């Protein structure tokens, strides 16, 4: 019998063990440019470690997932953080796991609104990008440099995500 995963709303407090939620936070807002622009300052910290490491900005185009969806693998990046911010304004799913002795534990699933992004801290187990509904573009900030910055883990028995409620 498959183990189904519940989908929870993405909140700063629930996501805190894994990284930061990127969203307009009134507490971090500063007016700049003569008062014509609101800057939401330092919402997440990019990490880039290792030889020749640098922070880069990418555009990812995610294809929508079909449901029910089997979560059969997780990945992590030992040398850098990785952030995803939707620029298509569409929601997406965020799947993360706590580390349990060098492997991912039971995944947790969060529903991110189209105005929320996430920053996975270095070494956080997460599932690859999960766009919903239609092809979606994401601004991705992560690390470039020498060394293998990808570790993958495949579950013997996948976990299952039911279709998210509209």
Curated annotation (Swiss-Prot):
Enzyme's top EC category: lyase
Protein name: Ureidoglycolate lyase
Gene that encodes it: allA
The protein's role, per its UniProt record: Catalyzes the catabolism of the allantoin degradation intermediate (S)-ureidoglycolate, generating urea and glyoxylate. Involved in the utilization of allantoin as nitrogen source.
UniProt keyword terms in alphabetical order: Lyase, Purine metabolism
Stated family: Belongs to the ureidoglycolate lyase family.
Catalysis: reaction(s): (S)-ureidoglycolate = urea + glyoxylate
EC number: 4.3.2.3
């Amino acid at each position: 019998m498959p183990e189904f995963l519940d989908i929870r709303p993405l909140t700063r407090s629930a996501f805190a063990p894994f990284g930061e939620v990127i969203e307009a936070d009134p507490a971090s807002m500063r007016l700049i440019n003569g008062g014509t622009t609101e800057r939401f300052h330092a919402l997440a910290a990019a990490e880039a470690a290792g030889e020749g490491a640098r922070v880069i900005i990418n555009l990812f185009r995610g294809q929508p997932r079909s449901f029910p969806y089997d979560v059969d693998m997780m990945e992590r990046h030992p040398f850098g953080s990785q952030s995803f911010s939707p620029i298509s304004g569409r929601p997406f799913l965020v799947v993360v796991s706590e580390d349990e002795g060098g492997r991912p534990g039971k995944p947790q699933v969060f529903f991110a609104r189209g105005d929320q992004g996430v920053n996975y801290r270095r070494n956080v187990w997460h599932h690859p990008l999960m766009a919903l509904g239609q092809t979606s573009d994401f601004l991705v900030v992560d690390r470039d440099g020498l060394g293998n910055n990808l570790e993958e883990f495949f579950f013997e028995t996948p976990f299952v995500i039911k279709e998210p409620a509209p």
